[in-house]
Amino acid sequence: MTAPSKTSASPVDPSPHVAAAHDKILIVDFGSQVTQLIARRVREEGVYSEIVPFNKAEAAFAAMKPKAVILSGGPASVLDDDAPQAPLSILTAGVPILGICYGEQTLAKQLGGIVEGGHHREFGRAQIEITDDCALFDGVWEKGGKYDVWMSHGDRVTQLPEGFRGVAKAAGSPISVIADDARKFYAMQFHPEVVHTPDGAKLIRNFVRKVAGLKGDWTMRAFREEAIEKIRAQVGSGKVICGLSGGVDSAVAAVLIHEAIGDQLTCVFVDHGLLRKDEGKTVVDLFRHHYNIPLVHVDAAKLFLGELEGVSDPELKRKTIGRLFINVFEGEAKMIGGADFLAQGTLYPDVIESVSFTGGPSVTIKSHHNVGGLPERMNMQLVEPLRELFKDEVRVLGRELGLPEVFVGRHPFPGPGLAIRCPGEITAEKLEILRNADAVYIDQIRKAGLYDKIWQAFAVLLPVKTVGVMGDGRTYEYVVGLRAVTSTDGMTADFYGFEMSFLGAAATRIINEVKGVNRVVYDITSKPPGTIEWE
């Protein structure tokens, strides 16, 4: 995605259509790489949460009026002269506060405690011992018990602020959890939001439900109703165009917008010839025949494959595909005529990634949407009905809207499509081999009942041929690589541990059923050091 344009709400502006209707928690971001996980854990409790950089938090707090605040972790040291701080207006607002890692340290220091640089740094799995009871531990941890947590810190609290007591300790931090029951301030040196702290979600649940007293009334049904109202208010009698990619995000956005404004929406589906087997037909059938949404289907395969001929560099592939997509989409949009708005399936992580925790431009802005840049070129305003949602929430909304499970639950698919699953030069022959191999592999996974247990699975056509023997003859054909990973957010991933019998059966089917392949390998690289996709 490009940085949000002037037609889009600021990434740190509280979302207006949820601000008045539900209990909310504000998450003050100090730069942790896992701050998004805090928001997800809170939302799992049915409570709406938003992330804002620490230097935007005071204004966001005043506008959002949250019922509680969470201070995130971060890479800085509170001992630095220019260390980020939580706004004093938030600390004195009378709302419950939970500090995590750096959030604990700055909370303690700002309230009069002492934080020192640790001689014993803690990174990774650690064990804490509960020394006293507190509301966070209710029904989860008991006094005297020892529990696994995930630490990532150098500094530590050595003297408590007035009103606080220490309720847990660890080898590298004798005060690992602190509590001020009167003010409902709690903080911990470890990270409860990550899966490596087994009971972390339960601790966050206790803060949300028992400490803050929030009932959790934010549901996808409520979001759907409020989003429809917002779309109608924004669009009025105007026309909207939406680019469909074949993925879940744009599909859910299109169905939601169509429910709000009907045939004021026209979808444009550019088939660049790099989709999975029968994917173009699936998209057309779903939107044109099942939902009766006005749809322009553009078969641009020859154009894209012609421009990609001889291109082997993966970044040049991406740029070529992006440029062509924009050109084709823009041409179709002009032919439709009269559109005032451009719809995009922007998600909340896209919004967060466009602004760093200091409030300035982020070092890396991910280009998630092929239509980035079109609003300015075509003088259209953006409609982004999913910009407050995470990927898993979009799937829930899709089910709420009645999209078929086979569509909603499908694995992520990259914008450049099969182009980045075919390292080296792309040809129509290679794409056909790859499509067929991928279809057999996914079919085998579904038949084994494993599809929903895997974050993403796909086949890759390697740019090499190997010698083989089939029947009584020698073959010299392509190698197919199989990839399957487990993940919660795609930021990190582990390879899926198939049984050898499964891999053997999948390889046999691919070699027997897909012409042009005589060897199959399985990729057991995790992320990091590798990436999920090969290019």
Swiss-Prot record:
Report the pathway entry: Purine metabolism; GMP biosynthesis; GMP from XMP (L-Gln route): step 1/1
Q: Which reactions is this enzyme annotated as catalysing?
A: XMP + L-glutamine + ATP + H2O = GMP + L-glutamate + AMP + diphosphate + 2 H(+)
**Which key words tag this protein in UniProt?**
ATP-binding, Glutamine amidotransferase, GMP biosynthesis, Ligase, Nucleotide-binding, Purine biosynthesis
User: Kind of enzyme, top EC level?
Assistant: ligase
Kindly list the GO CC terms recorded for this protein. Answer: cytosol
* Binding locations of ATP: 245-251
Recorded GO terms, molecular function?
A: ATP binding; GMP synthase activity
InterPro entries per UniProt: Class_I_gatase-like, GATASE, GMP_synth_C, GMP_synth_GATase, GMP_synthase, GMPS_ATP_PPase_dom, NAD/GMP_synthase, Rossmann-like_a/b/a_fold
Q: Active-site residues?
A: 101 (nucleophile), 191, 193
Q: What is its EC number?
A: 6.3.5.2
What are the residue boundaries of the Glutamine amidotransferase type-1 domain, all occurrences included? 24-217
**Residues in GMPS ATP-PPase domain copies:** 218-410
Q: How does it assemble?
A: Homodimer.
Q: What does this protein do?
A: Catalyzes the synthesis of GMP from XMP.
Q: What is this protein called?
A: GMP synthase [glutamine-hydrolyzing]
The organism of origin for this protein: Rhodopseudomonas palustris (strain BisB18)
The gene it comes from is guaA
